[in-house]
Every structure is written in C-alpha cells, then in structure tokens.
C-alpha cells in the first residue's frame, strides 16, 4: 500500500518538475518577445531622431528615470512605470510636420510585451539611478537592455 503512494508521489513530483522547468520553447518565446520589444523601442527612437523633428529640443527637456542596474526581466517593471510619461511626451511632440505613426499602438504593444516578459511579479520595486535621462538616453538604455538579455538567451 505504501509502495503505491510512494510511486504516486514520485510521479506527481516528476510531473511538477518537468512542467515548471524552463523549456527551449519558452526561451524561444521570450527571445521573440524581447526582439519585438527591441523593434518597438527602436521605432520610437528612429521617429524621435528624425531630422525633420522640429520638437526634438523640446522633447529633450523632459527627464526619465532608468534603473540603477537592469539585468533581469523583472527590471522591466521600471520601463512599465515610465511608459505613461513617455507616451505623454511623444503626444506633446506631435505636429503637422512631425508625427510618430501609431504612437499609442506602439506604447500599447510595449506595455503588453513588458507585462508578459516580467510576469505577474508586482512586489519588485525599482531602484532608479540618481541621474535622469533624456528621452533618447532612456530609449537607448532600454534598447541596450533588450540586446543584452537577447544575447544571453542565444
């Protein structure tokens, strides 16, 4: 009788271990999501750096916060916290000569990707760097973060 319970316990333990262990498909999914996030961030940066952007100097006056050390997916919480101010600055910069296409859609995509990548962890508190960043430095910082994480996955 105990033998059957022991075998059942072992079988359940093995099932739990195999289901919770990261698989190559989950790594591939994470990599794809990071690549999409990277492309969205680069698209925003390219739109801002567009030489026809008459509001660039105004956009550079707004300051953003970067984490002291972003090395894990949970640090995407810090990006999520800055998305609303980022969207507001991008909306202020819209003009008839300069228009970031689909800004709201890009920010929405970034938000969805960040939520999926960082998981449901909400107890993480960001430690921000003491120095603030311009919008260009902010986007470059997160682009570098994505590239760094992608390189560890490949």
Swiss-Prot record:
Full protein name: Interleukin-2
Any Gene Ontology biological process: adaptive immune response
Cited PANTHER family: INTERLEUKIN-2 (PTHR48487:SF1)
Species: Saimiri sciureus
Keyword Glycoprotein (UniProt): yes
Annotated keywords: Adaptive immunity, Cytokine, Disulfide bond, Glycoprotein, Growth factor, Immunity, Secreted, Signal
UniProt cross-references to InterPro entries, sorted A to Z: 4_helix_cytokine-like_core, IL-2, IL-2_CS
Lineage: Eukaryota, Metazoa, Chordata, Craniata, Vertebrata
MF GO annotations: cytokine activity; growth factor activity; interleukin-2 receptor binding
Functional summary from the UniProt entry: Cytokine produced by activated CD4-positive helper T-cells and to a lesser extend activated CD8-positive T-cells and natural killer (NK) cells that plays pivotal roles in the immune response and tolerance. Binds to a receptor complex composed of either the high-affinity trimeric IL-2R (IL2RA/CD25, IL2RB/CD122 and IL2RG/CD132) or the low-affinity dimeric IL-2R (IL2RB and IL2RG). Interaction with the receptor leads to oligomerization and conformation changes in the IL-2R subunits resulting in downstream signaling starting with phosphorylation of JAK1 and JAK3.
Compartments where located: Secreted
Position of the signal peptide: 1-20
Disulfide partners: 78-126
Family, as annotated: Belongs to the IL-2 family.
Keyword Cell membrane: no
């Amino acid at each position: 009788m105990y033998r059957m319970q022991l075998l059942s316990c072992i079988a359940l333990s093995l099932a739990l271990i195999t289901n919770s262990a990261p698989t190559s498909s989950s790594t591939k999914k994470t990599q794809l999501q990071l690549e999409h996030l990277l492309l969205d961030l680069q698209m925003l940066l390219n739109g801002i750096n567009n030489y026809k952007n008459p509001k660039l100097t105004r956009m550079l006056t707004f300051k953003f916060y970067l984490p002291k050390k972003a090395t894990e997916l949970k640090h995407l919480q810090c990006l999520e916290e800055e998305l609303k101010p980022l969207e507001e600055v991008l909306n202020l910069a819209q003009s008839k000569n300069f228009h970031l296409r689909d800004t709201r859609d890009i920010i929405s995509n970034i938000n969805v990707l960040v939520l999926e990548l960082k998981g449901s962890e909400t107890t993480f508190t960001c430690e921000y760097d003491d120095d603030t960043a311009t919008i260009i430095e902010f986007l470059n910082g997160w682009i570098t973060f994505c590239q760094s994480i992608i390189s560890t996955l490949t």
